[in-house]
């Protein structure tokens, strides 16, 4: 690194002072404020952590801005004056209670380099009476700011979330807090405070130097911010089952340090260290005398205020192998800096056999929390490999904010915590990876006034006591899903690039590898068992079979069944029907592709937890929810989907991972009870239902009438779609056992499925034994017959587009001449149970 071509912290200070010297002398009668500031465009995230302990103010507010040719007219409302987060943008504009805005005019701007610029602007009061005429021109931002103010200078670290325009009739505030792609835009500003007299440059320089030392943890003369870093060493996971096939030629093993990556250039002018957790370079004095520079990549830890640098790779000068790199560092880079010591590690190898290296790893791994690195000593074009006892992964997490509350903190029975959504990276897009709880303790604090989280004692090995991150950040997780610590370097990458943690496929590979023990990699039987486990997904009815086609043809049966479900859900979500004004909390069992998501939206529920054993159906449902939620996002209910079956003894604990306490007002079990309701599952199913259903809660069930099915003597075929060929236009039902039928609908199913026969007497008896009372029971044909007059007449008056289309579909479905729909509808039944 050539320091002569890079701006130092002192250069930024001088640029700011130089601009300030050009500002006119203050006039006491002048109502105009002269603002001179230095702005870092993509500041290191760590600077928030260094600034916060000395903050003179911390706050969040909504900023309203109208911009026109270098002029900004601004107003703001402190977030403490806004109740709840579900206000639409237009409502936020209506909350403005001051017609006196601030007019900011840009006089001069100079971009110093890619990371910083200086600006001189004037500020004055501006009476803006008719601002509501310019709603579409008003830009709204949520601003979180931490400020340190000294005599002549203020330092502001800001996170800005773009909310959209003032004309938008949607709640962007809640959306940006909850959506992973709505990232905060950070900035770091050093502003000179206007006084009645011009401040002398020496005083300013002294204050700015002190502030730079505070913020960047080094003298400004030794700070270089404009650095583009690319990791020179690629290290990838070596799957344990690949160990027996790895090339042993020149293969060596060394331990991995729990430090931070550092790219170092050593010259006779100084040692330049780019720290990955800081994302900038610090220069250190050196006694190194050679005219040839040395560049290396290593891992750094801090002990007694001295950096210990462990060599990973020598970049320049180039030598023939890794052992010569090690020798070079040992000979040339010893005792050249008081603040830094260069070290090398012991290399184990070479290996004569795979069993030898496996024996070594079996001994090493339990005592190495960060794992080991395998590398080839010759300079072949291959990455390094890592193996860990605990395959940690990096995920983007987003704290969850709820519909009405401005506080995400949840007060549990024995703990206080934040709930978060976890994401992995799917080719630059966030992929939902479940939810979790972040426990609030003395070492983890939620900073509610600036929407940030402070972690203590997680980076002590590198000399940092406190780390502060926004409510959206990248964190390291253990193989069991426990949050270990925030990743500062990866959070920097998330904020400024399209990065959401490890790629999803990499996460899956890490988790699968975790199930293999290092000592089992030569045992073919155990590896075979693991492979069989992945091939046979335990949650599917038959792991080798896909039961449903991707292209389903919806006919009259599907449309009319959907009508029945719509009535059922609307009725039991109604606040007036049950005289209950509270929004319902819903548990949906075997929810499938999520065809009823929209019904519950119109039912105005507060939350829905869905379960299903089929991960493919879960994926399609989540896609559907995200699509529905992309329009009026913040008004959609909270939704979680977990892969689980009601037949499992772990069902309740799995649900509790996302629904921490309380019980459900509604349990939705549509067209699926016939896969689980059998004597061998009664106890488990009913215990799960009892545990999760609130007193007075309702269980909504739709299924086929077992009493009618039990009377079948041979295969019965119903024509259900007159527009399809005869090979696809039917649904067949065949009794194959006293308690089982075989159902096949070729228009939507790839093969027949077995279902249990659910008889009314058995259903009501078992439910009654567990405290559930049958309060409603009706066949589909009865509901449709009662609804025909309404569908064919009164519903034609409906004008709302979506509802109008809904009834038009049902009117067409009722014209099902030439089919057996009426007969088939007799076989479908609704049960509603209420918990005593």
From Swiss-Prot:
Signal peptide per UniProt: none
Record: residues binding mRNA: 561-562
Site-annotated residues for mRNA cap binding: 599, 624, 674, 755, 828
Catalytic activity of the protein: a 5'-end triphospho-ribonucleoside in mRNA + H2O = a 5'-end diphospho-ribonucleoside in mRNA + phosphate + H(+); a 5'-end diphospho-ribonucleoside in mRNA + GTP + H(+) = a 5'-end (5'-triphosphoguanosine)-ribonucleoside in mRNA + diphosphate; a 5'-end (5'-triphosphoguanosine)-ribonucleoside in mRNA + S-adenosyl-L-methionine = a 5'-end (N(7)-methyl 5'-triphosphoguanosine)-ribonucleoside in mRNA + S-adenosyl-L-homocysteine
Cofactor (UniProt): Mg(2+)
Triphosphatase-guanylyltransferase, as annotated region: 1-532
mRNA cap 0 methyltransferase domain: residues covered: 552-836
Enzyme Commission code: 3.6.1.74, 2.7.7.50, 2.1.1.56
Binding site for Mg(2+): 35, 37, 189, 191
GO CC entries: virion component
Highest taxon listed in the record's lineage: Viruses
Positions of the record's site feature: Essential for RNA triphosphatase activity: 74, 104, 123, 156, 158
GO molecular function: inorganic triphosphate phosphatase activity; metal ion binding; mRNA 5'-cap (guanine-N7-)-methyltransferase activity; mRNA 5'-triphosphate monophosphatase activity; mRNA guanylyltransferase activity; polynucleotide 5'-phosphatase activity; RNA binding
Main subcellular localisation: virion
Residues annotated as the enzyme's active site: 256
Keywords, sorted A to Z: Hydrolase, Magnesium, Metal-binding, Methyltransferase, mRNA capping, mRNA processing, Multifunctional enzyme, Nucleotidyltransferase, RNA-binding, S-adenosyl-L-methionine, Transferase, Virion
Keyword Hydrolase attached: yes
Keyword Manganese on entry: no
Positions contributing to S-adenosyl-L-methionine binding: 541-542, 565, 590, 612, 670-672
Gene3D superfamilies: 2.40.50.830, 3.20.100.20, 3.30.470.140, Vaccinia Virus protein VP39 (3.40.50.150)
Biological role stated in the UniProt entry: Catalytic subunit of the mRNA capping enzyme which catalyzes three enzymatic reactions: the 5' triphosphate end of the pre-mRNA is hydrolyzed to a diphosphate by RNA 5' triphosphatase; the diphosphate RNA end is capped with GMP by RNA guanylyltransferase and the GpppN cap is methylated by RNA (guanine-N7) methyltransferase. The heterodimeric enzyme is also involved in early viral gene transcription termination and intermediate viral gene transcription initiation. Early gene transcription termination requires the termination factor VTF, the DNA-dependent ATPase NPH-I and the Rap94 subunit of the viral RNA polymerase, as well as the presence of a specific termination motif. Binds, together with RAP94, to the termination motif 5'-UUUUUNU-3' in the nascent early mRNA.
PANTHER family associated with the record: MRNA CAP GUANINE-N7 METHYLTRANSFERASE, MRNA GUANINE-7- METHYLTRANSFERASE
Subunit structure: Heterodimer of a catalytic and a regulatory subunit. Intrinsic methyltransferase activity of the catalytic subunit is weak and needs to be stimulated 30- to 50-fold by the regulatory subunit, which is itself catalytically inert.
Family note: In the N-terminal section; belongs to the dsDNA virus mRNA guanylyltransferase family.
Entry comment, domain topic: The N-terminus contains the triphosphatase and guanylyltransferase domains, whereas the C-terminus contains the methyltransferase domain. The N-terminus is involved in binding to the termination motif 5'-UUUUUNU-3' in the nascent mRNA.
Protein name per its UniProtKB record: mRNA-capping enzyme catalytic subunit
Organism ancestry: Viruses, Varidnaviria, Bamfordvirae, Nucleocytoviricota, Pokkesviricetes
């Amino acid at each position: 690194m050539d320091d002569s071509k890079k701006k130092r912290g002192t250069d930024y200070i001088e640029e700011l002072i130089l601009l300030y010297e050009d500002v006119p002398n203050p006039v006491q009668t002048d109502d105009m404020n002269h603002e001179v500031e230095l702005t870092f465009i993509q500041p290191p995230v760590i600077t928030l952590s260094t600034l916060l302990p000395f903050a003179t103010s911390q706050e969040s507010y909504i900023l309203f801005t109208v911009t026109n040719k270098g002029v900004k007219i601004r107003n703001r409302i402190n977030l403490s004056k806004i109740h709840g987060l579900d206000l639409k943008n237009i409502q936020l504009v209506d909350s403005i209670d001051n017609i006196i805005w601030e007019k900011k005019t840009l006089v001069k701007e100079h971009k110093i380099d890619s990371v910083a610029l200086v600006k001189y602007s004037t500020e004055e009061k501006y009476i803006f009476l008719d601002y509501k005429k310019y709603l579409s021109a008003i830009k709204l931002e949520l601003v979180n700011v931490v400020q340190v103010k000294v005599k002549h200078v203020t330092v502001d670290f800001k996170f800005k979330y773009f909310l959209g325009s003032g004309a938008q009739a949607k709640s962007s505030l809640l959306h940006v807090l909850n959506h992973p792609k709505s990232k905060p835009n950070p900035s770091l500003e050093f502003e000179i405070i206007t006084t009645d007299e011009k401040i002398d440059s020496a005083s300013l320089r002294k204050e700015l130097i002190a502030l730079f030392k505070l913020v960047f943890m080094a003298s400004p003369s030794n700070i270089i911010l404009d650095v583009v870093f690319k990791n020179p060493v690629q290290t990838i996971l070596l799957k344990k089952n690949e160990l027996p096939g790895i090339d042993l030629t020149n293969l060596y093993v060394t331990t991995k340090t729990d430090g931070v990556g550092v790219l170092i250039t050593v010259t006779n002018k100084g040692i330049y260290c780019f720290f990955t957790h800081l994302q900038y370079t610090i220069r250190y004095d050196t006694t190194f005398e050679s005219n040839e520079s040395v560049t290396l990549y290593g891992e750094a830890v801090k002990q007694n205020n001295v950096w210990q640098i462990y060599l990973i790779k020598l970049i320049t000068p180039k030598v023939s192998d890794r052992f010569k790199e090690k020798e070079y560092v040992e000979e040339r880079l010893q005792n050249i800096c008081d603040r830094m010591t260069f070290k090398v590690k012991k290399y184990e190898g070479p290996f004569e056999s795979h069993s030898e290296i496996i024996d070594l790893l079996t001994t090493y791994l339990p005592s190495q929390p960060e794992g080991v690195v395998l590398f080839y000593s010759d300079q072949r074009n291959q990455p390094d490999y890592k193996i860990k006892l605990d395959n940690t992964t990096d995920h983007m997490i987003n704290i969850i904010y709820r519909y009405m509350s401005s506080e995400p903190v949840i007060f549990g029975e024995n703990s206080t915590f934040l709930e978060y959504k976890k994401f992995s990276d799917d080719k630059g897009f966030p992929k939902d990876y479940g939810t979790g709880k972040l426990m609030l303790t003395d070492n983890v604090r939620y900073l509610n006034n600036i929407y940030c989280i402070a972690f203590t004692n997680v980076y002590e090995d590198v000399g940092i006591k406190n780390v502060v991150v926004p409510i959206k950040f990248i964190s390291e997780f253990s193989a069991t899903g426990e949050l270990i610590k925030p990743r500062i370097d990866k959070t920097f990458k998330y904020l400024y690039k399209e990065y959401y943690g490890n790629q999803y496929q990499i996460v899956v590979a890490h988790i699968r590898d975790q199930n293999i023990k290092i000592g089992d990699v030569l045992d073919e039987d155990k590896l075979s068992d693991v492979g069989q486990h992945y091939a046979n997904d335990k949650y599917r009815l038959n792991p080798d079979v896909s039961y449903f086609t991707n292209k389903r043809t919806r006919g009259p049966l599907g449309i009319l069944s959907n009508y029945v479900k719509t009535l059922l859900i609307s009725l039991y979500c109604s606040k007036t029907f049950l005289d209950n004004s509270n929004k319902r909390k819903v548990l949906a069992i075997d929810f499938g592709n999520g065809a009823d998501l929209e019904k519950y939206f119109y039912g105005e529920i507060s939350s829905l937890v869905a379960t299903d054993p089929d991960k493919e159906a879960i994926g399609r449902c989540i896609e559907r929810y995200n699509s529905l939620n992309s329009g009026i996002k913040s008004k959609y209910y909270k939704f979680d989907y977990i892969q689980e079956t009601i037949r499992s003894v772990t069902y309740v604990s799995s649900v509790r991972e996302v629904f921490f306490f309380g019980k459900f007002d509604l349990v939705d079990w549509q067209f699926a009870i016939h896969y689980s309701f059998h004597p061998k599952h009664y106890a488990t199913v009913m215990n799960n239902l009892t545990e999760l259903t609130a007193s007075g809660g309702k269980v909504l069930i739709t299924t086929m009438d077992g009493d009618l099915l039990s009377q079948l003597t041979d295969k019965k075929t119903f024509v259900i779609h007159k527009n399809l060929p005869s090979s696809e236009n039917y649904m067949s039902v065949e009794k194959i056992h006293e308690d089982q039928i075989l159902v096949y609908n070729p228009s939507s199913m790839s093969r027949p499925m077995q279902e249990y026969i659910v008889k009314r007497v058995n259903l009501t008896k078992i439910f009654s034994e567990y405290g559930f009372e049958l309060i409603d029971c009706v066949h589909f044909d009865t509901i449709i017959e009662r609804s025909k007059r309404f569908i064919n007449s009164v519903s034609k008056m409906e004008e709302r587009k979506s509802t109008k289309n809904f009834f038009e579909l049902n009117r067409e479905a009722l014209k099902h001449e030439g089919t057996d729909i009426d007969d088939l509808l007799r076989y479908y039944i609704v049960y509603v149970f209420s918990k005593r």
